[in-house]
């Protein structure tokens, strides 16, 4: 007999994280989406994986993820409702062997579908797994101050990253590889998925100008914390600029010393010699 999936750690983690993202104002209405790669061992504790509820076609090639299981937020679903009604707002899916569809094993009980950003998520998982086999989470949200920065700050990866590093001491330690930035593109398309996944090969944070941010990590906490750290730096930057601008900041020499202390290396070329 399988256990009650409502007791699964992965369901509780997803419910807690979506609630926090909504509480922070980063996922208004049905904004934002999360995909969580699950191990088959943890899935079979709660579900009979041979019992397919329905099969949902995909418009891109997911063959590299064939057979893998994911917990995915639903299309058009509000993060504020996940904790109260997980089975309506979430789904456990398995990628078909040919990579052209996903099998729904649990959830979306009102007939819902996985997030419309599934192509961007799956492409990002493929990219991250190619460089980090332990990657499990891809998270998208509309972090307020990071979003605002894309209207007022130079949109080059080096300068955007340097500003974030200079705003909070922990930033270099948390994301020494910096942030990636793609052009503005229509969401929910393969094009934006391809652009995001290409950046994901070198970065875990990808800025979508005038839209939001993508983060990737080994766990829900790590991924949330990654975005949270960058967003805090963006908030500090916003406050600093409203107070008259930067008069002093963490220097490049101090950033180098920070990296040495915590055994991280800033992305090559991002610090001045």
UniProtKB/Swiss-Prot annotation:
UniProt subcellular location: Cytoplasm
Residues spanning the signal sequence: none
Enzyme Commission number: 4.1.2.19
Catalytic site positions: 117
Cofactor(s) listed in the protein's UniProt record: Zn(2+)
One protein family per Pfam: Aldolase_II
Domain of life: Bacteria
The reaction(s) this protein catalyses: L-rhamnulose 1-phosphate = (S)-lactaldehyde + dihydroxyacetone phosphate
Binding site for Zn(2+): 140, 142, 211
Any one biological process term the GO annotation gives: rhamnose catabolic process
Matches recorded under InterPro entries: Aldolase_class_II_sugar_metab (IPR050197), Aldolase_II/adducin_N (IPR001303), Aldolase_II/adducin_N_sf (IPR036409), Rhamnulose-1-P_Aldolase (IPR013447)
Gene3D superfamilies found in the cross-reference section: Class II aldolase/adducin N-terminal domain
SUPFAM superfamilies registered for this protein in UniProt: AraD/HMP-PK domain-like
Protein's pathway: Carbohydrate degradation; L-rhamnose degradation; glycerone phosphate from L-rhamnose: step 3/3
Gene Ontology molecular function terms on file: metal ion binding; rhamnulose-1-phosphate aldolase activity
An annotated GO cellular component: cytosol
Enzyme class: lyase
Keywords from the UniProt entry: Cytoplasm, Lyase, Metal-binding, Rhamnose metabolism, Zinc
Annotated cofactor note: Binds 1 zinc ion per subunit.
Family of this protein: Belongs to the aldolase class II family. RhaD subfamily.
Function: Catalyzes the reversible cleavage of L-rhamnulose-1-phosphate to dihydroxyacetone phosphate (DHAP) and L-lactaldehyde.
Protein name, UniProt field: Rhamnulose-1-phosphate aldolase
Naturally occurring in which organism (per UniProt): Listeria monocytogenes serotype 4a (strain HCC23)
